[in-house]
From Swiss-Prot:
Record's protein name: RAC serine/threonine-protein kinase
Expression (tissue specificity): Ubiquitously expressed. Present in ovary, where it is concentrated at the basal side of follicle cells.
Gene expressing this chain: Akt
Annotated Gene Ontology cellular component terms: cell cortex; cytosol; neuronal cell body; nucleus; plasma membrane
Organism: Drosophila melanogaster
Record note on domains: Binding of the PH domain to the phosphatidylinositol 3-kinase alpha (PI(3)K) results in its targeting to the plasma membrane.
UniProt keyword list: Apoptosis, ATP-binding, Cell membrane, Cytoplasm, Developmental protein, Growth regulation, Kinase, Membrane, Nucleotide-binding, Phosphoprotein, Serine/threonine-protein kinase, Transferase
Residue list for modification Phosphoserine: 30, 586
Pfam family, one: Pkinase_C
Length: 611
């Protein structure tokens, strides 16, 4: 990866779909975040163009004769690979309480396998059971029987109908890979055993089941239950169900002529960032002259990348929350091919940017930022929301120097004290031990992230780091955090409490949640009421000369001209329609007080395509 030439390096977010879909609740995307890719860092764009479009539902593939080149040292194909032009159905349904077998279903083979993560390349031992109906089910421990095993133990559920198998000896000896294509992307599931005999037994068993299912035209069983719809991704939702998911509060278009916000209501000033999903543009609302950051996303890419769930979550959280240290939403609307979020614009830069230039912050400055972060997270927790992706790149400063938490795509709703989730997501360097250890986790996961960012501020480095993710995860799980000699005992005690491996023993991990942290001696000088009211002056004020000063944004983008070109030259720019796939997406807040009667509101349905 090409990172900014700073002391710190940007960390890429890893996201996963529904609990235990396909890969131990790990269908992560491995995004590549560069220093110039501001859209993925600033305004809630936590997914990236290099994501693998895996999903929690059945993934249908068609084999092709020519395989795209992936590495210079191509793996050796097994001599017995399946014939081409077959269908490969690698499904990853959600965990259910059990999968009762039919009378015709039999266990073909079972035993321990090492399974490799698709993007975070660590190996995990799983007990797999191959059934005659094509299901390859992976468990944390050996199940008594698959019909009565609790969902906590079922981590993988693949269907191998029509799969192609390759045997390789990299990166571990006795490895075999199940491969297929989704869209134009190669999808792989990688396993390893201890001997050539074991590998031969597994590959032959899988190949025989796969071939038989194709020969007889059987369709592998895939449970339809979804136990966690908040995290489920696009491919698991039928179009009619998806439409319901996008029904959100707000003013929507109707035949009575109710005014709507469109792209025509804004004057576009500068490009703040761009990526595969779209652009973030600094704009001025014509009726009020107020500045906003408008994030314009491509629907087609959101659907193809299976990012509907994260977009839905982001939309819900933005609409339902109101806190001085969280980015806020003014409007959301859509064109025929775009989703548009009009969001609060802050131009003080990322904490990552500032810390990269200053190397460390003083304890007083860290205390101030930490207090505002803790206040924001405590508010989210009070609303039943956990954040799950705390890192310096997602922490912005406004023009006065106050914290603004951005990027809500990985939030999890309906998690209060005692309630847990198990989706594997976050950023590798910030992952809590309980997430890495496949345990259910709750609110305490955010306090681990708080400990990591505050450690970075005070110490100028991550508490645990290694370029090799296997080593990194081992450090997070077993290594004790070390502190430099020059920090105070209060700071050391706070960080040690936040970075406790056991979430039950972690500071803030109890029923009192945020209150336990606020009562720590390190924050003795903080008046929490005054903090929320912004009565405490920030220790640093960004050096911006005006609201349109974009010095903390990448000049690669801010120097670009803003071009919005309708595909139909005769159609007005920015006209919108609530098409069936995304009905009632619009959220327009107190529109009547801001648009004014002179605003031109278009009612046609032509597209607004961005160059």
């Amino acid at each position: 990866m090409n990172y900014l030439p700073f002391v710190l390096q940007r960390r890429s977010t890893v996201v996963a779909s529904a609990p235990a879909p396909g890969s131990a609740s790990r269908i992560p995307e491995s995004p590549t975040t560069t220093g110039s890719n501001i859209i993925n860092i600033i305004y809630s764009q936590s997914t990236h163009p290099n994501s693998s479009p895996t999903s929690g539902s059945a993934e249908k593939f068609s084999w092709q004769q020519s395989w795209p080149s992936r590495t210079s040292a191509a793996p050796t194909h097994d001599s017995g690979t399946m014939s081409i032009n077959t269908t490969f159905d690698l499904s990853s349904p959600s965990v259910t309480s059990g999968h009762a077998l039919t009378e015709q279903t039999q266990v073909v083979k079972e035993g321990w396998l090492m399974k490799r993560g698709e993007h975070i390349k660590n190996w995990r031992q799983r007990y797999f059971v191959l059934h005659s109906d094509g299901r390859l089910m992976g468990y944390r421990s050996k199940p008594a029987d698959s019909a009565s095993t609790p969902s906590d133990f079922l981590l993988n559920n693949f269907t191998v109908r029509g799969c192609q198998i390759m045997t390789v000896d990299r990166p571990k000896p006795f490895t075999f890979i199940i491969r297929g294509l989704q869209w134009t992307t190669v999808i792989e599931r990688t396993f390893a055993v201890e001997s050539e005999l074991e590998r031969q037994q597994w590959t032959e068993a899988i190949r025989n089941v796969s071939s038989r299912l194709i020969d007889v035209g059987e369709v592998a069983m895939t449970p339809s239950e979804q136990t966690d719809m908040t995290d489920v991704d696009m491919a698991t939702i039928a179009e009619d169900e998806l439409s319901e998911q996008f029904s959100v509060q707000g003013t929507t278009c109707n035949s009575s002529g109710v005014k709507k916000v469109t792209l025509e209501n804004f004057e576009f000033l500068k490009v703040l960032g761009k990526g595969t999903f779209g652009k973030v543009i600094l704009c001025r609302e014509k009726a009020t002259a107020k500045l906003y950051a408008i994030k314009i996303l491509k629907k087609e890419v959101i659907i193809q990348k299976d990012e509907v769930a994260h977009t839905l979550t982001e939309s819900r959280v933005l609409k339902s929350t109101n806190h001085p240290f969280l980015i806020s939403l003014k409007y959301s609307f859509q064109t025929n091919d775009r989703l548009c979020f009009v969001m609060q614009y802050v131009n003080g830069g990322e904490l990552f940017w500032h810390l990269s230039h200053e190397r460390i912050f003083t304890e007083d400055r860290t205390r101030f930022y930490g207090a505002e972060i803790i206040s924001a997270l405590g508010y989210l927790h009070s609303q039943g929301i956990i954040y799950r992706d705390l890192k310096l790149e997602n922490l912005l400063l406004d023009k006065d120097g106050h914290i603004k938490v951005a990027d809500f795509g990985l939030c999890k709703e309906d998690i209060t004290y005692g309630r847990t989730t198990k989706t594997f997501c976050g950023t590798p360097e910030y992952l809590a031990p309980e997430v890495l250890d496949d345990n259910d986790y709750g609110q305490a996961v955010d306090w681990w992230g708080t400990g990591v960012v505050m450690y970075e501020m005070i110490c100028g480095r991550l508490p645990f780091y290694n370029r090799d993710h296997d080593v990194l995860f081992t450090l997070i799980l077993v290594e004790e955090v070390k502190f430099p000699r020059n920090i105070t005992d209060e700071a050391k005690n706070l960080l040690a409490g936040l970075l406790a491996k056991d979430p039950k023993k972690r500071l803030g991990g109890g029923k009192d949640d945020v209150k336990e942290i606020q009562a720590h001696p390190f924050f003795a000088s903080i008046n929490w009421t005054d903090l929320v009211l912004k009565k405490i002056p920030p220790p640093f004020k960004p050096q911006v000369t005006s609201d349109t000063d974009t010095r903390y944004f990448d000049k690669e983008f801010t120097g670009e001209s803003v071009e919005l070109t309708p595909p139909d030259p005769t159609g007005p720019l920015g006209s919108i329609a609530e098409e069936p796939l995304f009905p009632q997406f619009s959220y327009q807040g107190d529109m009547a007080s801001t648009l004014g009667t002179s605003s031109h509101i278009s009612t046609s349905t032509s597209l607004a395509s961005m160059q």
